[in-house]
Design a protein with these regions (language model features):
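Extended accessory regions or peripheral subdomains of proteins
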Residues: 1-31, 36-75, 112-195
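Glycine-rich, N-terminal phosphate-binding loop and its surrounding beta-alpha-beta segment
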Residues: 58-116
């Protein structure tokens, strides 16, 4: 059952809780970790972990693909308006809580080239990496690690105990050590770099 404000349960404290849980989720599509970096700074208070979105939006150029359950739709409408419509349908509208900075909703990537949908920009940059202009997941749950209060909060707009069981059932996925697949090489000449 969906709730207006999320149900919250507290998990045992561990400073590395974000990495601990994310290591079990990182293999899932749309899993994300926003990490504070453990810095002693007011803006480094929280780590946020999400995965398993209820909906995703991906924009390349003029097309946005919205994927919800088994349904995929493509639109050329303004991607930010499409995102707002999807958020409205998800009906995730929690009240402000300074101890829970993210209580579900949209999390993702807004690339510089998304600006081309709203204003004319010069076409001087080389597209040297293939990334969407926008890639956003809509999440109805999150894990929030608060490094000031030393709390780990699992919140969900649906059954929080079912989400906890799901989270705890995720298995660690061993990762291979990083290795180069080819020699290092520059993407520009020394002269180009100096310009």
């Amino acid at each position: 059952m969906k709730t207006l404000s999320p149900a919250v349960i507290t998990l045992p404290w561990r400073q590395d809780a974000a990495e601990f849980y994310f290591s079990r989720l990182s293999h899932l599509p749309w899993a994300m970790l926003l990490h504070s970096g453990y810095a002693d700074h007011p803006y480094s208070r929280f780590d946020i972990v999400v995965a398993d979105p209820i909906c995703t939006l991906t924009t390349f150029g003029k097309e946005t693909v919205v994927s919800e359950s088994e349904k995929r739709t493509t639109t050329t409408d303004d991607p930010l308006q499409v995102l707002q419509q999807v958020l409205d349908r998800a009906d995730i509208r929690p009240t402000h809580n300074e101890d829970l900075p993210f209580q579900g909703g949209a999390l993702g990537l807004f690339g510089y080239d998304l600006g081309r949908r709203f204003e004319s920009l010069p076409e001087i940059a080389e597209q040297d990496i293939v990334l969407p202009d926008m890639a956003v997941g809509i999440y109805d749950w999150a894990l929030i690690v608060d490094h000031q209060r030393h709390t780990v909060s699992l919140l969900s707009h649906n059954d929080v105990n079912a989400r906890r069981a799901w989270l705890e059932s995720q298995q660690f996925s061993p990762q291979e050590d990083f290795t180069l697949t080819s020699d290092w090489q520059s993407n520009m000449t020394r002269e180009q770099y100096g310009e």
